Amino acid sequence: MKRRTFLRTAGASVVGATALAGCAGNDGTDTESAGTGGFSGTLQVATYSSFTGKDTAGNWLKSIFEAAHPGVTVEFTTPESGLNQYILRQQNGAEIDADLYIGLNTAELVRADQELDESLFETVDEDLTRADTVKSGLQIDPDGRAIPYDTGYISLVYNGNEVENPATFDALTSEEYQGDLIVQDAGNSDPGRAFLLWTIAEKGPDGYLDYWRDLLDNDVTILSDWEPAYNAYMNDEAPMVVSYSTDQVYYHGEGVDIQKHQVGFLNDQAYANPEAMALFADADAPDLARTFMDFMLSPVAQAEIAVRNVQFPAVEGVDPGAEFSQYAYEPSEPVTFSYDELSGNVEGWIEDWRREIAN
């Protein structure tokens, strides 16, 4: 059994959902942290859809960075197949039409390294002035290519009017919670994959499939991704869903039944899923991309990313504000797998899960 890694500091992960990403932060216009210089041209940034658009972290970063660099335009692209698009392009010898990738997790980085002969990304940690401010427990790449910018904790969200927090993994398989849980497909969904890895950390590579068979016997619902799963939960199709421990950051205030947005940790744990950014090795604007990455690690940007992405900052000493801190929950025992632990294992775990459980 692979050793599981416990994080001792807060972190962040991608929400990966349109609803949560629309949570707006402060309307600050401080451009100092974005740097200055003689840059001009276009920075092409590949990311996920909910990072861009009105009131999102991406739109705020673009506005502030362009104001600090009048000759620069930041353009976002949202590849339908995510990182897989760029893995396939490199395998086929096609041009990588982006400078920077935002939204990379550990499992995706491992997959890219396993499937490609040459690295898709460039080492940058020694080139960034703020790279050493990232919390040490969040680092996902031993080669310094992928730099975390936020982290989330995968947990349960449950309706306290209907059920109590199960508190343990074993409780989820009991008759008391039969038919009560909605999860996501681990092959298609970031939170679904994180929850699968959490069960592997708890039950071990030799026991996790038996645990999932017990979940199936207890009528767990498996849906394709976070959004349909959360929508089903909000439509009262089941009183529990795998989601994020920052749920109440978005869902609180007048008219909101906060009991429907209770955060549940299993065995006092949640799965930490840091989200990272990485410079493509064949980037057309590498220096501009590095400057943008440093800006994303600045305290002002980190606070905005936390609130707008509804995730925890990746950098030490950042305060997202009292409201965020009141409603964002951190587990006493975060758990995750490291790059080395996932390397050579994660794809097999997912394929076995697909074959034995999802089918």
Please describe what each predicted stretch is:
Residues Y48, D55-T56, D97-E237:
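Extracytoplasmic ligand-binding site segments that recognize negatively charged/polar headgroups
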Residues A107-R111, M240-Q259, N309:
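A ligand-binding cleft/hinge motif common to bilobed small-molecule-binding domains
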Residues A270, E275, F280-F337:
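Mature extracytoplasmic/periplasmic domains
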Residues C23-A34, G38:
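Bacterial lipoprotein signal-peptidase II cleavage site
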Residues M1-A19:
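N-terminal secretory signal peptides and thylakoid transit peptides that target proteins
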Residues A322-N359:
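Extracellular/periplasmic bilobal clamshell ligand-binding domains
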Residues G152, R213-L216, I222-L223, V256-A281:
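Periplasmic-binding protein-like
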Residues G38-V110:
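Early extracytoplasmic/lumenal segment of secretory-pathway proteins
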